[in-house]
Each structure stands twice: as structure tokens, then as C-alpha cells.
Amino acid sequence: RGSNLTTHPLRNIKDLVVYM
């Protein structure tokens, strides 16, 4: 999900927290 970072940066961060 690299393109998601540009479309939804905030969402990407939340996904990262869930991944951790």
C-alpha cells in the first residue's frame, strides 16, 4: 500500500499502528 500514503496519509498511519 504505497499509493495509499499519498491518497490517505492519515489512514496509512492508522494502518501502521494496527500493523504494529
Swiss-Prot record:
Keywords: Aspartyl protease, Glycoprotein, Hydrolase, Protease, Secreted. The keyword Hydrolase applies. It comes from the Eukaryota. GO terms for biological process: proteolysis. It is an enzyme of class 3 (hydrolase). It is found in: Secreted, Extracellular space. Glycans are attached at residue 4. GO terms for cellular component: extracellular region. Its EC number is 3.4.23.-. Chorionic epithelium (trophectoderm) and placental cotyledons. GO terms for molecular function: aspartic-type endopeptidase activity. Belongs to the peptidase A1 family. On the 2D-gel the determined pI of this protein is: 6.9, its MW is: 60 kDa. This is Pregnancy-associated glycoprotein 60H. The lineage of its organism: Eukaryota, Metazoa, Chordata, Craniata, Vertebrata.
